[in-house]
Each structure stands twice: as structure tokens, then as C-alpha cells.
């Protein structure tokens, strides 16, 4: 899976499409057709799933977890994490460890 191998990088749609020898527009259309999601949504969801694992299984700081999954800006990482999970990374880490 290309996303699994490249999610830590600034992995663009163009690079993903090139990896499978498709035009980016056509690749995007196929992704949407077969997954119901855009490339950006798939990448974001994959990154957040990895972040959740790291938050639960390590003592890494939130900003470091964000960097490990491809987000250089800690505020942007927190915003995206909250959009996907409904809570901030700190809230997620605290709730999961309490429960």
C-alpha cells in the first residue's frame, strides 16, 4: 500500500498516481469510485490512525507524534486529529489511558 509506505512524507496525489502509472486526475477518480474518499481523506485517515497508535503505545509528546505521522505543524495536526476523532490528541491520550 503506497500510503502506508509514504504517509510520513509530503506524499502528494501526483506521486501516488505516478507510482501506479496513472494520470493524477484519473487516479483520483478511481480512488473516489472505489473507496468513496479522496486521496487527501485517505492519507489523513491513515495518518490519524497511526497517530492514535503512537499516542496509546508510546510516551511521545503530541507534537512529536504529529511529526512522526507527517504533520510538521503541531496546531494543524491537532486540528485534523480533532476533526477526525472528535477530540484533541491530548484528550484522546488522557481518555484512553484513564479507561
Regions found by a protein language model. Give the residues of each.
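Terminal helix-turn-helix DNA-binding modules in bacterial transcription factors
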Residues: 1, 5, 10, 33-72, ...
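Residues within helix-turn-helix
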Residues: 14, 25, 61-64, 74-75, ...
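C-terminal accessory/binding modules appended to enzymatic or scaffolding proteins
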Residues: 15-24, 28-29
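Residues within the alpha-helical elements of helix-turn-helix
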Residues: 19, 68-69, 84
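Short hydrophobic/aromatic patch on the recognition helix
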Residues: 27, 31, 76-77, 81
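…primarily DNA-binding HTH/wHTH and HhH modules…
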Residues: 79-99
